Amino acid sequence: MSRFIELSHTIREGMKTFPGLPGPRSVLLFDHAGSERVYKGQAEFLIASLHLCGNTGTYVDSPYHRFREAPDLSALKLERLADLAFVKVRQRDRLGRGIGPSAFDGLSLKGKAVLVETGWSDRWQTQEYFDPNPFLTEDACRYLVDAGAVFVGIDSANIDDMSDLRRPAHTVLLGNGVTICEHMTNLAALQTNEGRLHAVPIAWQGGATFPVRAYVVLS
């Protein structure tokens, strides 16, 4: 029997994912009581309009997030988002914030997702979450591209050093078609590299980023 490991934060109305971006909100179109009248007491439904920034909760970046003429959410290949073999790299005890290529030495990464556990998600929904964050260096990202990784996730507030306006991690990874997933959580629950990762956004044409329900299936 399969077991599932949740890797996404729950989205709650008004929560903050990134400084300066609006929190999600739900606008009720009609509720159970109102719909009961429409269906003459035979059924009832709730329908709401959900308003959220693409960068809400745990989300993936398409290349269009960084580059004007690049593939958007609707162009992402499912084989690079679902049923992925993965390698988790634990970096809770790193020296300094920047995670360099040595963290991935000797790992077989071709065609796989790389999940970087920093422990930063322990600060989720606190002001400390937006302190200077753990990130991947430009050299680390080039290493991952050269090694053939197809998906890179991290449990930090950003895969880049937020003080570096060049955003080299986004530039290198998305520029080479590697999907990014930020604000992951519960990576400590992955005790081995067994199982398959799934993290699929909706196929929104013209969309650049969108929340995902990221999880691992253990057989």
Predicted regions and their residues:
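Active-/binding-site microenvironments in catalytic and ligand-binding cores
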Residues: M1-S219
